[in-house]
Structure formats: structure tokens, C-alpha cells
């Protein structure tokens, strides 16, 4: 069995789509629109085969959890894997230079990964990770 896709509600569908395309090489399918429900979405595919659905609909309330400082029950982040620690460092620099907050790292974790954590345009937590390798 495999995880088919994850989904994120957003108030800025095009901004979110462009973020995942530009920084994470997501490949969008054509926008789906249901005018009756005032719903729109994109499915983005990634090199690994994973997919992410970005959704927007009138009336969906904003997330009131503090996703920057606090942790909460439920899904807390998405992680993107890269091949090398240099790629982790490069992606952190690219996002920081584009104005995105780096919450932590790049750093070695206690369970053998090298990663950093950032936020997407909707303040959803994202990680970029690889296995730690001694130099």
C-alpha cells in the first residue's frame, strides 16, 4: 500500500501552486474547478511519485493554530527528500534568499537525518531532508 496524496486548503491557490512548482519541482495538472461548490484545486506530482492536492473553496475557515511557534495534534509537516546534505543547504539558502523563514537547521537530527524546516506561503511546515553522512 502507498500513500496516494496529501491535501492542503489555501486561500491563495495560484501562489501556493507556484511555490511548490518553483521550489520543489512540482508538476501541476490542469486546474479543476467546480463552480457550484466554488471549489478549485490543483494536483501536483513530484519526482518520487508522491502527489499534493492544493485546494481553495469559499467558506473554508482559516486555520487558527499557531503553526510557527507551537506544535499541535494532527499532521504537522510535509518533508521533501533530497540526495545530499549539500542539496539541503542549497535549498535552505534558496528559500531564505526568496524571503521564506527558516525555522530550524540545517542540522543533524538525533535519528540520523540532516534537515531544515521552513514554511510555505500558507505557513504550513515543510522539511527538506536527507540521511546524515560524516564528512
Q: What does each model-found stretch correspond to?
A:
Residues 50-56, 60-62:
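Conserved segment of winged-helix/HTH DNA-binding domains
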